[in-house]
């Protein structure tokens, strides 16, 4: 455990600035220069346990090539036997999420200024062949002067990760900010999906609320596929047009970065960011990722990739456990995804219920199943409801709810449904 006053190389560690599932960030001082930094401390054992070495390496490699005033800088990476230390630019103004929650929406003038900086940073990334894939308010920090700094590139992709069809194929991001083509689990253009996320951020900046939101994840996804969020009357026509063009559900007709920069609303009082893009020498130790060979050889297509439904990411701001498959089997309500067609999925669920001896009541995409059992010692059984929510033709959510009954039987039922009908990557992750 790191204690206050401990040193890592020339850095003296101080208070904790933030903490996530697999890392914590501490304030640090360079004892030679007095300069302030933020050091992200990652336990190697945690990397091994969660199989996220690929993502952390990707974050480091991505930050190495980015040098822009609106992007958090990586200064160096150090390692001990048990930890990795990423020495980052210290940004003291908190994140945009906290700013909106505490003070509400921004004026259109303030919001446009921040949005211009966001687009400058994202445009720079895209020109470098880097696509963030997890842009959200929590990943936009504010410095002491109110300038934005984009952070958390753990889900980012470089242009060489595109397949032969020229598209990315890994579902990444946070549900409220994810583009419809990403949720559809098909190939997508990284630049277009980032633009969608920027559109969501612009909407929140100017309205103080999310464009696509609901307590039910399936409903959120339906709203995203439909697009066309309600825009308050106080939003100017120029801003309204910009939002609608960025939140176009069709990635082909969605506005590009060039189109955004050419828009009159964006150009108003716009001053492009100045930056020096000369190459720097980064101190990246060769032994930072010395792990067992099988860890290094893990395929990027394995469940180590974090997506919108398997979020084990570096941030604690978003926890999907209340929505999705990380819920404990003992809990009354469990959800998982399936790539089967909704009609086939419902028929297969009905078959499994029947084979396990349940009596069924069926209504639309909802099944109520009851099983009564008696033993010498007690009367037992199980009453459950299963419902299918269609998010897209190739992606459905199954929700299983226990009304009452035997927890062990409920677990058997859930595990069979998941094994036979769930997405294969989820089966490996959940039943490990």
From Swiss-Prot:
Its EC number is 2.7.11.1. Its cofactor is Mn(2+). Residues 331-360 are annotated as: PPI. One of its GO terms (molecular function) is ATP binding. Keywords: ATP-binding, Kinase, Manganese, Nucleotide-binding, Phosphoprotein, Serine/threonine-protein kinase, Transferase. ATP binds at residues 17-25, 40. Residues 11-266 form the Protein kinase domain. This is CBL-interacting serine/threonine-protein kinase 17. It comes from Arabidopsis thaliana.
